[in-house]
């Protein structure tokens, strides 16, 4: 445990940010999984809706710094390509 007050505060702040990042990444994984299930099932209309939701969540995560901007862009691109191949 840190003895300096500022270090103690940083420990608390890091714990909060880690929890937030973990929650956001978990939501992203779930949303991507739901999209992939819709594509595999052949529900293209549902998959389009899921893709817009995933794009929104990935963009928000990139804006917050949870995932890198390039990583989010790459994932969005790959998911869109996957949907277009299914159509």
Swiss-Prot record:
GO terms for molecular function: small ribosomal subunit rRNA binding; structural constituent of ribosome. NCBIfam families: S20. SUPFAM superfamilies: Ribosomal protein S20. One of its GO terms (biological process) is translation. It comes from the Bacteria. Pfam families: Ribosomal_S20p. Keywords: Ribonucleoprotein, Ribosomal protein, RNA-binding, rRNA-binding. GO terms for cellular component: cytosol; small ribosomal subunit. Binds directly to 16S ribosomal RNA. Belongs to the bacterial ribosomal protein bS20 family. This is Small ribosomal subunit protein bS20.
């Amino acid at each position: 445990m840190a003895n300096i007050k500022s270090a103690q505060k940083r420990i608390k702040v890091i714990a909060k940010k880690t929890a937030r990042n973990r929650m956001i990444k978990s939501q992203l994984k779930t949303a991507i999984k739901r999209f992939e299930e819709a594509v595999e099932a052949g529900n293209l209309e549902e998959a389009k809706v899921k893709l817009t939701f995933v794009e929104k969540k990935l963009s928000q995560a990139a804006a917050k710094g949870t995932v890198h901007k390039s990583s989010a862009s790459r994932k969005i691109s790959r998911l869109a390509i996957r949907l277009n191949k299914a159509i």
